[in-house]
């Protein structure tokens, strides 16, 4: 893992789920509602995944989530459920359901004032990310959003590298901030240091190396 060098950091690349926001208290009902809607409209018999199985998928690319949860369906069928999940999640986020972690708003504003380039590097879709940032009035602090398009951008690592290219910087100039293995992998792929959010959704022993460890998002302010 790349060592953290404070004076080299220009870009802060944030994951969303388990880093800035937790959808844990709305994910289960939303997924179940969407799967039940599909069952009713299609007449298919499906075993609804358990809460534990659903929560374990948080932070993975969307298509991978639904392949893991509903392998018996084809991609078009999974996408129809996934699209309904997105609509319902965005509605709930704008109703201020879900949880923005304590200190996020002040931390983001302070880092913006310190002239860091703030970016999002998430496996989530644009609508979901924008709903979170917009509903908490944080959207204006972040640069243009890059998301997985399953073409030129296929992973979180590709997202991070696209920001490095866009701002003409190298890996050591970006700090990847997140809670899951995909965030660790993105940092490693981009040659960047990794700030591990231990308060997020990581499984025990999922993250075994990091450049920094955060017990809360505002810990970043002390490191930077």
Region spans (language model):
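Glycine-rich phosphate-binding loop signature in dinucleotide/nucleotide-binding domains
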Residues: 5-7, 113-116, 167-172
